[in-house]
UniProtKB/Swiss-Prot annotation:
The gene is trmFO. Pfam families: GIDA. This is Methylenetetrahydrofolate--tRNA-(uracil-5-)-methyltransferase TrmFO. HAMAP family: TrmFO (MF_01037). The lineage of its organism: Bacteria, Pseudomonadati, Pseudomonadota, Alphaproteobacteria, Hyphomicrobiales. It comes from Brucella canis (strain ATCC 23365 / NCTC 10854 / RM-666). Its cofactor is FAD. Transmembrane segments: none annotated. Its main location: cytoplasm. The keyword Cytoplasm applies. Keywords: Cytoplasm, FAD, Flavoprotein, Methyltransferase, NAD, NADP, Transferase, tRNA processing. Belongs to the MnmG family. TrmFO subfamily. Catalyzes the folate-dependent formation of 5-methyl-uridine at position 54 (M-5-U54) in all tRNAs. It comes from the Bacteria.
Amino acid sequence: MSNNTDLSPVHVIGGGLAGSEAAWQIAQAGVPVVLHEMRPVRGTDAHKTEQLAELVCSNSFRSDDAETNAVGVLHAEMRLAGSLIMACADAHQVPAGGALAVDREGFSQAVTARLEAHPLITIEREEITGLPPTEWGTTIIATGPLTAPSLAEAIAAETDADALAFFDAIAPIIHFDSINMDVCWFQSRYDKVGPGGTGKDYINCPMDEEQYEAFVAALIEGDKTDFKEWEGTPYFDGCLPIEVMAERGPETLRHGPMKPMGLTNAHNPTVKPYAVVQLRQDNALGTLYNMVGFQTKLKYGSQTGIFKMIPGLENAEFARLGGLHRNTYLNSPVLLDNVLRLKSRQTLRFAGQVTGCEGYVESSAIGLLAGRFTAAEKLSQAAVPPPPTTAFGALLGHITGGHIVTDDEPGKRSFQPMNVNFGLFPPVDVPKPEGKRLRGKEKTIAKKRALSARALADCRNWLSLY
């Protein structure tokens, strides 16, 4: 440890999954931490206890398969990095097939006990009502989707009010290689060339009148989820669920997000589509496409069945399904640098769901990275981001720059929260067995295994730098 090492404490605001993991990583590096948690001084409508890292929804950390599932790869990388959250999850696992599910009370009690027992961690039970004072120095804000209103207002004032969202408007995202391009075609409406575009920036899925009418009927009849009481999010016209638009009248969608104007079917130029579903590139790699204007409150089972009615999407594989719910998060690609610092105030770092990741594991992983980056800086070391080929790096890349921001949908935010998935990883060459050509499911599994093996190898190399 060098003589100029700054051992003043790092402050972490928020004792959820991300904040707990960040505090642990910092303390394990030998740097003192003050962890601020407002519960039980101030509760939320979702939390039921005062435990740290309380799981407010499911008790599942999803698949633990580190060979063919991206979240399983993230589990494995977190274990390699000494994650507190994963250690406590493993210790309190309950049977759930191939998934990692936990005893929620035992899990959060274990996290709380480990943090309380750490000699370098001080836990302060208090509400932080504004941005931290400058004398605090380095601070991580990990306040999650239910950030207290006063702190959310302070963050909005610092970052620009338009840079902080208070709900998700999530449209489904599809893996490009599952789209049938014998039916669909590339074209921008009226062949318009936008910033960085070519005039062929959208994938178009055509419908005739009969297909359109059946699709609208299915949207109206599909099973919907209701808002939880604590979400309290009203609909507004700039972001109506697709099924609500369908209920407003049979022609609403084909004069809205499914309008066919300015498009010519490259496979059948003489036949004008009655309606068109457009897909827009969602990441810089071009491996993911989102369904334009298709934010929805349909239940997941209904979404997959109904959206596969769309011509060209019969075999679609979804990286993420749609939703609309309460969530406080930053427009991170604009506001944060590649090590999660606020560009306008670099003593502030953000972590967890407030950065625009989705899910327990993803939030914890971003907390882990924020903690490691912060500890490195406090110890006068370089904060080195993980390679984009790792699950850590793929997720970080989505948050801090991999997402394409577009201006063609006025009133709608381009950046939306995301779970980790293989579509965020750079492509990999799949090794072919000698004398054999891989096809279909066999090829898909081989590709996932290659991505997973590369990710874990590169993660080990990255961790060796710390």
